[in-house]
Amino acid sequence: MEDIGVTVKEKLTSKKDRFTQLTSLLKNEGFEVELICEDDFTSITFNTSNPDPIEISIQLFNDYFRVCYWDGYGVAEFYDYKNFSKAFKKFTKFLTKSKS
């Protein structure tokens, strides 16, 4: 079973370019964002005057990906996926939600 986790972890770190591209697109649209990429955690935070800004993240837990959304005011959502593509799709939907 540990081999599955390692494979998934490698997939997450190998997708850094996709998150970097999203960050660049957001910056081109005028948003101030910060990207954090680690082995088992990737997040994009919207830098605003709110002391607790919007954050969207993908975290690695054993053999699944947890996509989290924090709106900066008290609404938190998270979804778990075994497939990175589905998790990334949810991640981008949360980014779209954050832009409005």
What positions do the PLM features span?
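Short intrinsically disordered terminal tails
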Residues: 1, 96-100
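Negatively charged, low-complexity tracts enriched in Asp/Glu with abundant Ser/Thr
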Residues: 1-50, 73
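Charged, low-complexity, helix-prone segments enriched in Lys/Glu/Asp/Gln
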Residues: 11-15, 65, 94
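Residue-level detector of alpha-helical secondary structure
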Residues: 23, 27, 85-88, 92, ...
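Alpha-helix boundary/interfacial micro-motifs
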Residues: 46-47, 79-80, 88, 99-100
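Intrinsically disordered, low-complexity regulatory segments enriched in Ser/Thr/Pro
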Residues: 52-90
